[in-house]
A protein has these predicted regions:
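Nucleotide-activated donor-binding/catalytic signature segment of Leloir-type glycosyltransferases, i.e.
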Residues: 125-146
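Active-site proximal beta-strand in glycosyltransferases
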Residues: 2-19, 39-40
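Conserved acidic donor-binding segment of nucleotide-sugar-dependent glycosyltransferases
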Residues: 194-203, 211-217
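Short beta-strand->alpha-helix junction loop in the catalytic core
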Residues: 17, 45-46, 65-76, 123
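Acidic donor-binding loop of glycosyltransferase active sites
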Residues: 150-164, 177
Length: 254
């Protein structure tokens, strides 16, 4: 126990603390607060979930810090964007793939010069959509995904479940996509500009995609703002990590 007292303990929450063994109850979370030197969350949403029903005394603890995921920041020529709607993620109902498919098949029937790219797989669920411009690419490397985002005009992340953060929408925003997301969990924290679906269904998604296709000025405005206002890049997050490390070893926090 003496050796343990000399060490610094940090816990990182990448998912909803209230659904993870060891942090469900108030007692468990108070133990974590008292035992750990730092508690890192990947979004404001996961932080708030951890603090649910805890006394105000703990709300502003210096032990608690949000450090989001990040990606590279690059120059994107919006004039080179293709008429592509892209979906990246597990092809299951939790990710809203069925909602996306129903909406986009209707879009492709109405707008003959647009196509959809689908990146991902899901061996546990079989949700299939067939259209010659509904192109399933399967699993791709992260570099490939970033390049696909770079040439896509519209990206959709329409999860049903409360995403703790949401990497695909973050990366789509960084590459200048007009991003449509569901208002679930930490997804709204992944974009600075875009469309947030407060009512998630295929009809609403269809309408928002159609609006972006028809209104080119609106689409390009969102794309431009996504690029210009994007700040969750590797450099920024690395600086936050440096501050956290210095704080961890320079002083005791509570």
């Amino acid at each position: 126990f003496t050796n343990l007292q000399k060490r610094k303990f940090v816990i990182y929450f990448h998912n909803d603390p209230l659904t993870m063994s060891g942090s469900v109850t108030i007692k468990e979370r108070l133990f974590i607060l008292n035992f750990c030197d730092k508690i890192i969350f990947n979004s404001e949403w996961t932080r708030k979930r951890f603090l649910t029903n805890l006394e105000k005394f703990y709300q502003n603890s210096e032990k608690i810090q949000v450090i989001c995921q990040s990606t590279t920041k690059v120059k994107v020529d919006l004039m080179k964007k293709d008429k592509i709607i892209i979906f990246v993620g597990k092809l299951n109902k939790s990710k809203g793939y069925d909602i996306f498919g129903k909406a986009v098949i209707k879009i492709l029937k109405e707008f003959k010069d647009w196509k959809a790219l689908i990146v991902g797989d899901e061996p546990r669920e079989k949700i299939d959509f067939i259209h010659k411009r509904f192109i399933k690419l399967g699993y791709r490397s992260n570099l490939d995904v970033l390049n696909l985002f770079k040439k896509s005009s519209i990206a959709v992340a329409c999860s049903r479940w409360d995403e703790p953060f949401g990497r695909s929408s973050l990366e789509a925003s960084s590459r200048g996509c007009a991003v449509i997301i569901s208002n679930k969990g930490g997804l709204p924290e992944t974009i600075t500009d875009g469309v947030i679906l407060n009512r998630l269904n295929s009809s609403n998604l269809f309408n928002e995609i159609k609006k972006l296709i028809i209104n080119k000025k609106l689409r390009q405005t969102i794309q431009s703002k996504s690029i210009n206002n994007f700040y969750l890049d590797d450099k920024y997050i690395s600086s936050k990590i440096d501050i956290y490390r210095n704080d961890l070893f320079d002083k005791k926090a509570f």
